[in-house]
Amino acid sequence: MITVRCDVVMANDVSGPIAFRAMEKMGASRVFDPSKVVMVADHFAPAKDARTAELLKHMKDWADGQGVTFYGQGRGGIEHTLLCEEGWIVPGSVIAAGDSHTCTYGALGAFGTGLGSTDIAACLALGEFWQAVPATIRVEFTGEKQPFVTGKDLILAVIGEIGVAGGNDHVLEFVGEGAAALTIDERLAVANMAVEAGSENGLAPCLSASIRSAPGMR
């Protein structure tokens, strides 16, 4: 077990409000570093009713009070795609987020792990979390993709091979010339679904040329 420092902490409109309350119960009034905290209106934007509108307002008010970045209605989007596009995710960084598909960031050579709202509260306050170092499963893609084969097809084939629990307590590491040839969009699809095999993360090769082509990368 190791203590891992967070380069980015993110929560959405489901995990965020719960984390805010848990953080308050901890006795923490401020986040560890506002420049490393992001809130995204992902699940309930645009608001479908008054209750969800109030929830989004609560998130915005909290973010404004903490001085953290908030991607709200009209500025938000699919949280994991958004953070990649906005340049929050860089190779080698560690991202803790209150969503199971945080493994998506492995597409850009980052370690992203999804945590529960109580753990996210601790990350917001302390900027760190405990992590058991996962073992690695090497997934080698050889040859070239055939026409109409997508990144999602590849990861579904992997999950079909190892099963929905085959990656438990592991990281999937995608290697080989087939992995290196994947586009950024394909990498995102492959890494995003690593959790569907129980994996903590799905790491793709960090190739400078393809990483530089990612929208918003800086």
What kind of feature is each model-predicted range?
Residues 1-218:
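Fe-S-dependent hydro-lyases/dehydratases of central metabolism
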